[in-house]
Regions:
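A short, structure-level motif marking secondary-structure boundaries and short turns
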Residues: 28-31, 73-75, 102, 179-180
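Acidic/histidine-rich catalytic cores of soluble enzymes
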Residues: 20, 83-180
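Short loop/turn segments at strand-loop or loop-helix junctions that form parts
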Residues: 22-25, 59-63, 168
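N-terminal pre-domain/capping segments
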Residues: 1-55, 76-80, 87, 94, ...
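Acidic-and-aromatic substrate-binding clefts and catalytic sites of carbohydrate-active enzymes
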Residues: 1-2, 25-31, 35, 64-70, ...
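Active-site groove signature of glycoside hydrolases
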Residues: 48-71, 96-105
Length: 180
């Protein structure tokens, strides 16, 4: 199929894929939508395994259908829902020999290094790791403490970081704006 065609094409040009992204909302409260999302994650994991991609990456969502920021994103309830919904995806990744890597983002459920560490510890799988993007841990409310936040992330998550994504930011109109 298509996956094997891509695998041959990438091999022909000596290309490797570092991460296959699957940025869907594992905290979607709509049960039917969530079921489809979980199946989509599993399809991405299968596709990654066929392509020889070691990592499927994702962010950590929001407890609403719109995948938008709200204060509830940082609640204990949202974190518990995310962990519960992530668990079967990671179990499938284990079976397929693929790493599932979550990317902490300030506006999402896993918004800081401590919450990321908790997800890793509660799921307890070597197939769950971290995509570390330091700028994603920052917001207008905390960017002036960026050195402390980034150092804490490396200390708390360092052994479980699968990938690092580097970018910069500027403050514009009272908000952080990511720049390449």
């Amino acid at each position: 199929g298509y996956a094997l065609y891509l695998k041959r094409l990438f091999a022909k040009y000596e290309l490797d894929i570092a991460v296959l992204g699957c940025y869907l909302n594992l905290a979607n409260p709509n049960e039917e939508s969530l079921r489809k999302i979980v199946h989509r994650y599993m399809a991405h994991i299968r596709f990654a395994a066929l392509l020889g991609v070691g990592v499927v990456g994702t962010e950590t969502g929001a407890p609403n259908e719109e995948y938008k920021y709200e204060e509830k994103n940082h609640s204990e309830e949202a974190l518990e829902i995310f962990i519960k919904n992530l668990r079967p995806v990671v179990e499938y990744a284990e079976k397929m020999g693929v790493i599932m890597a979550i990317e902490p983002v300030y506006k999402h459920i896993v918004c800081n290094p401590k919450r990321a560490r908790r997800v890793l510890d509660e799921i307890g799988s070597p197939n769950l790791q971290i995509i570390f993007d330091p700028v994603n841990l920052l917001d207008i409310s905390n960017y002036q403490k960026r050195d402390t936040i980034i150092a804490e992330a490396v200390e708390v998550l360092g052994d479980d970081i699968a990938m690092v994504h580097i970018k910069d930011f500027v403050v514009e109109d009272g908000k952080l704006k990511s720049v390449a």
